[in-house]
């Protein structure tokens, strides 16, 4: 499934959930009417994410006289868990810090132009530290839609320097998302869809440790790698 079709599917899910909740609010008693007047708040979130890498092929001719092209052919869903710390700046505008652990991997397939010749598993587990602004609409009963945007830094976990595709440990990028707050008697549930776009080239291209190894052709075939991910979370506050 492509990123576009998956994004549309999740966006459709949000659009179904939110209007359904909205329609149910007419005449409903507001639950926790003072919840959003808090100056500070905490919470946690659970979710699934689809990690991916944007690959820049070098087009280099390898020692066998051919060329290789790398791509990420399929999606492998990963698991995400994190905590939430927020401060209300003004009514409807919040600043949130969202330390999150993402566990997952990305398959990278190499072709010679006619067939696949190799497939590697690229570890993309990371500890991510997003900082985002959340702007919410006026509350309608027990429902409130919102949008969020910000940036993040991330520490890659589990990568080994001996791997053919070795990712540098520090990543950073931008994020944008949307969701809705659903108010219940004892907590607030917030489904959210977020897109992360990495800005750093994480690939370690200088690999003297692989000199003399025939597999270095898989490393030299790639000039750059940057991350991106689609994240669906359920936040509890």
Short names for language-model regions:
Residues 92-95, 141, 186-189:
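Repeated loop/turn-to-beta-strand initiation elements of outer-membrane beta-barrel proteins
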Residues 29, 169, 183-237:
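Predominantly the C-terminal beta-signal and adjacent terminal strand-loop region
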Residues 51-52, 58-116, 231:
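Glycine- and aromatic-enriched membrane insertion/assembly motifs of diderm outer-membrane
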Residues 38-40, 75-79, 123-129, 143, ...:
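Residues that define the transmembrane beta-barrel architecture of outer-membrane proteins
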Residues 55-61, 107-115, 157-165, 202-210:
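Outer-membrane beta-barrel translocator domains and adjoining extracellular loop/strand segments
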Residues 29-31, 66-71, 114-121, 160-166, ...:
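Extracellular loop and loop/strand-boundary signature of outer-membrane beta-barrel proteins
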Residues 44-48, 79-89, 99-101, 129-135, ...:
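Residues on the lipid-exposed face of transmembrane beta-strands in outer-membrane beta-barrel proteins
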Residues 24-78, 235-237:
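Short glycine/proline- and aromatic-enriched beta-strand/turn motifs that initiate or cap beta-hairpins
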